[in-house]
UniProtKB/Swiss-Prot annotation:
The chain crosses the membrane at residues 30-50, 67-87. GO terms for cellular component: host cell membrane; membrane. The keyword Aminoacyl-tRNA synthetase does not apply. This is Transmembrane protein 069R. It is a multi-pass membrane protein. It is found in: Host membrane. It comes from Frog virus 3 (isolate Goorha). Keywords: Host membrane, Membrane, Transmembrane, Transmembrane helix.
Amino acid sequence: MERSATLEMLNVHKPDARQTGDILSRYANALWPPALAYAASVAAGYVFTAGPHGCRCGKAMTEAARVGVFLGVLCALYNWMGSGDSFA
């Protein structure tokens, strides 16, 4: 069986420009909240470990705490954006 016949049987088609734009828009909407949460956790990790203030008060922040900050910010963003239907 030829490849084109197989693709027709599977109803596979090449997306047009509008569909491609819709797909890229959905991916962009789904990726920015985790990226923002990661940036916030990196900033919190910097403040609590290296810090611009130079004191040793935050040197004990562990990797588990950084993951907690990341997950907390991610959950806050998820709740702030609503039910999550905009991620789909």
